[in-house]
Every structure is written in structure tokens, then in C-alpha cells.
Amino acid sequence: MSKRTTYCGLVTESLLDQEVTLKGWVHNRRDLGGLIFVDLRDREGYVQIVFNPDFSEEALKTAETVRSEYVVEVKGLVKKRDPQTVNPKIATGQVEVQVSEINIINKSETPPFAINEENQNVDENIRLKYRYLDLRRQELAQTFKMRHQTTRSIRQYLDKEGFFDIETPVLTKSTPEGARDYLVPSRVHDGEFYALPQSPQIFKQLLMISGFDKYYQIVKCFRDEDLRADRQPEFTQVDIEMSFVDQEDVMDMGEEMLQNVVKDVKDVEIPRPFPRMTYNEAMERYGSDKPDTRFEMELINVSELGEEMDFKVFKDAVNNDGQVKAIVAKGAADQYTRKDIDALTEFVNIYGAKGLAWVKVVDDGLSGPIARFFETTHIEKLQSLTNAESGDLVLFVADKPNVVAQSLGALRLKLARELDLIDESKLNFLWVTDWPLLEYDEDLKRYTAAHHPFTAPKQEDIEKLDSEPENAQANAYDVVLNGYELGGGSIRIHNGELQAKMFEVLGFTEEQAQEQFGFLLDAFKYGAPPHGGIALGLDRLVMLLTGRTNLRDTIAFPKTASATCLLTDAPSEVSENQLEELSLRIRH
């Protein structure tokens, strides 16, 4: 049979009365006794093909033997469908192909799940074990088409802006950057290990010192950390670095690139500039450093009520350097029973809150277990602070500021989902700026970098590294989309003395800093330009653009929540010979 002339999903009225050759998989087969209809599928979609003895008795005879997922090639004429059989839901729904020739290329056993049913409830482990079948589903095929369009758009934009695509090593040195490294033993250097990169951070800075000015890479990164729905042990990063720039330059470039991507991929115009808020403002208003701004329900500080009311929980929190904050679920008073609110209390307990106080606003005041503590003036103040109205449910947490933020921030998202407050069609981009440079780790009894050790402090805060490092702010910025951290960036330290000081604040001895990062400190001696950049999570970006809720749906061959590959059964044991070559012994 001749070469394929087009894809199944591209057969439309533009090809009427033309002969086409198609190759693909049998999606559906319907035998009407003397007539056989088959939906033939490839990556672009499917088209109805018809076997009729008037066209070819031989082709009809062969079609009687085909089953789901057989691989076939057909030749035939494109014709308009009978008006009663038109399918407006698919691009090919106006036409059909009257088959004159068919050849079975390959047969298929009955698949473990039906590929022609999109909304079936198939166990995810089965889908991942037979991922090559799962990827045949049109839903996932479209996801990966959009992933390709996304990377193409990114490359086109960065190429237009003068960026060089430069690869960095995959086998590199283990350095303490936050998560655990994946280690690779060296056969040649006994007892020594490479690490798979958590990011190309240091190498891209070295490329700036090398004079390349603008670098990017769409690169695999590896982190041995606990998994969540939006995390994978290996993930793809859009890594970008620029010389002679400030924070505004990098953010402006990032906005323009994302605006281009959304326009190219979804044909949606994203307004610029993106909204901005400081880290402190995000935590105050949303209880999160990656706020979802598609709905209201902000956290409201009502600590002054705690000072005035004779309610011990509120008063104790305020008197012990804590605070009282509230969120208002508009019109939700009748939707939540006492039992429902008990479940919400258990939910905030997960985030460290000792309890969840609440009142319902009614026409003549308040109802609920703490309503008796509210005098008339307190009710008026509550309504003034929160704009709560009759029918609203008001929920309070009184605790240390970090506990209040985490618990109410999480509760805000939970309520929004339960009350269907989120407009899923929105793409709300946001910059979070003015991050703390450092965080204090109570377990380690030392400071750790809030982003990474190479982030520059704000110029005016450099002196604070000696006196009050906890108050130093970073030249750092995160871009957030719909409540997910899409990417993070910063202006980097480009001065060896300041970098050495940063290592000192982080608890490195001079010898440790030299052993771990001596090559970077040496590079700073030879004229390092000011530089900064950003790294975006490609998998996460595609997840949000396609409306998926699980990162695994945007990765062709993902790992499970326990970091295993059900398809290949990785990780797996290796032979004694392999271990011996690497001078390794497994201790059970």
C-alpha cells in the first residue's frame, strides 16, 4: 500500500472526494450486518471509515476480522456523512472514508482497559503499568501535544531574544542545595560519587562568568524528596540566566515569555504587568507564599477583638505574641453543620492549630458556641472588620502567626473547593517578591537559605548579615499561577567576599565552603558580571495549562508516589558483578 497521505484526525471536508491512505489503530468497530463501521485513530484524533461490499467485498471480509487496537492501513475516498450520522463533537464528524483496501499491519490482544472510553475509572497503577496504552487515549495525546507546543513556544521566544541553548553536566558534584541528591557511584574512582543535578544553578552562573550573557536550557533535574501530587523525583525545568540585569529585567522577560506561551498554546491574552505582592503581604492576606487569587476569602486580622473580648482563647493568643485571624465563607452558614465544622477543625489540626472557633451570622446577631462572648460592640466590630452579613460563616484561628497563616491558608483552599468558588477557566499569574533571605531551622539550630545559597540579599540589607540575618530580604521573586509556584528566581551574588559571607551565615566553615564550592569562589576572582535568572517548572506549567490536577499526567513515563516506575519495575536490584565493579556492598 502507498505512503500515508494524512492523519486520521485531519480528514475533513477539505478532502472531499479525494483518495486518502490512513494508518492507525482500531478505536471502535460496529458490525451492522453487511456494513462495518470503524473509528480509526492516530495521535491527531479519529475518523469514521466504512466497509461496504459495494466498495470492496475483499476489504469488508478483512474488516470482519479486525478488533480493537489492531494496527491497520486503509485506502479509500473521503465522502460526506449522511446528515443523520454527522458527529459535531469531533473535527472529522462531517465526513467518512469509504474503504477500498485494508491491510492488517499488526494484531492486538484485548487491552487491560478500554482505550476508547475517556472517563472510565481505571486504577492509576494499571494505567502506569501499561503506560504505552494509556498514552493512546486522546485526552493524554492532547496533553502531550500541548506540552510540545509549550516547549516550542518557549524556544522560539528565547531564541528571538538572543538566548543561547547550552547543555550543562548531568553527572556533577554533590552539593548541599536543599533536597537529598541522587548519587551515582564512580567505577573509575573507587569510593567516590557523582550526583544528578537538582538544578543547573552553579553551572549557569559559571556560564555568565564565561561571558555568554543569555543562557537557557530545558533540562531534567533530580531531587530525592518526599513526593506529592505536584512533585516527581525527576522533573523538567525551563532554566534561564542573564547578565547585566536587575530584578525588573528578569521579571519583565518572564512575563513576556509566559504571555507568549499562553497566547500560542491556548489563544488566550494574559494581561501584563502581572499583579505583584510582597512575601509578607501574601502571608498576611492569603496565608500562603503562593496564593490562589481566583477567589476572595482573604484572611482578616481581628486581633483587636481578642484584646477586647472576654474569650480566653483569643486573649491568650494575643497576649503571647500571637494573633487572631478570620475567614468568611459567604452565604455558607446553612451549608455547614456542627459535624461538618468538627471535620474542618480536624483539618486545621494537621497544620498545628489547636482549634477552630466559629460563628454564624444571623439576622439578630450571631449563633454558635462562642457567640455568647460577643457583646453588641464586638459584633459591630466583627462585621466592620470582615464585612460579614447574615448567612455567612466566620471561622477563626488564634495562635502563633505562622500557625494561623498555614492553617487558615489551607482551610481557605479547602472551603473554596467545597463551595465551588474557583473559576477553573482563569489563569491568574502573580509575582511574589521581597522574600526573606534566610530561614531558621529549629532542628539544625542554624539558618538555611530560603531559596538557595547563591541568592543576593537586597543591597541595603547586606550589613544585616552580621547583626540581624533573620531580617535580611532577598533579591528574589517567585511567579505563581492559580495557587501553584510556577517558578522562582533571583539576582545572584557575583562577589566572592559576599558569597563567602553567605556561606558563613549558613554555618559553613571556611574549609567546608572551599571544599564544596571552591570552584565557584575561584571563578568570582576573574571578573564576574552581575547576573540573575529564573527557573520554571515545565511539567507544572503544562499541568495548569491543560487543566490537569496531577503532574503525572503531563510526564510521558512518570514515577508513582513512591518513586517507582511500574512499567519498567525501576528501581530494581542489580547483579553482584555490577556491585563488585563499583566496590559496593548492600547492607540489609
Curated annotation (Swiss-Prot):
Checking InterPro entries in the record gives: Aa-tRNA-synt_II (IPR004364), aa-tRNA-synth_II (IPR006195), aa-tRNA-synth_II/BPL/LPL (IPR045864), Asp-tRNA-ligase_1 (IPR004524), Asp-tRNA-ligase_1_N (IPR047089), Asp/Asn-tRNA-synth_IIb (IPR002312), AspRS_core (IPR047090), GAD-like_sf (IPR004115)
Q: Which GO terms describe its cellular component?
A: cytoplasm
Reactions the enzyme catalyzes? tRNA(Asp) + L-aspartate + ATP = L-aspartyl-tRNA(Asp) + AMP + diphosphate
Query: Which UniProt keywords are present, listed alphabetically?
Result: Aminoacyl-tRNA synthetase, ATP-binding, Cytoplasm, Ligase, Nucleotide-binding, Protein biosynthesis
Recorded GO MF terms: aspartate-tRNA ligase activity; ATP binding; catalytic activity, acting on a protein; nucleic acid binding; transferase activity
Question: Per UniProt, where does L-aspartate bind?
Answer: E177, R223, H451, R492
**Protein's cellular compartments:** Cytoplasm
- Chief localization class? cytoplasm
Biological process annotations from GO: aspartyl-tRNA aminoacylation
Q: What is its EC number?
A: 6.1.1.12
Superkingdom of the organism of origin: Bacteria
Q: Where does ATP bind?
A: R223, D224, E225, Q232, E485, G537, L538, D539, R540
Gene3D superfamilies associated with the record:
Bira Bifunctional Protein, Domain 2, GAD-like domain, Nucleic acid-binding proteins
Q: Which Pfam families match?
A: GAD, tRNA-synt_2, tRNA_anti-codon
Keyword Lipid biosynthesis included in the entry's annotation? no
Spans annotated as Aspartate: 201-204
PANTHER family (UniProt xref): ASPARTATE--TRNA LIGASE, MITOCHONDRIAL, ASPARTYL/LYSYL-TRNA SYNTHETASE
**HAMAP family from the entry?**
Asp_tRNA_synth_type1
Describe its assembly. Homodimer.
Role noted for this protein: Catalyzes the attachment of L-aspartate to tRNA(Asp) in a two-step reaction: L-aspartate is first activated by ATP to form Asp-AMP and then transferred to the acceptor end of tRNA(Asp).
UniProt family annotation: Belongs to the class-II aminoacyl-tRNA synthetase family. Type 1 subfamily.
Q: What is this protein called?
A: Aspartate--tRNA ligase
Q: Per the UniProt entry, what species is this protein from, by scientific name?
A: Staphylococcus saprophyticus subsp. saprophyticus (strain ATCC 15305 / DSM 20229 / NCIMB 8711 / NCTC 7292 / S-41)
Its gene name is aspS
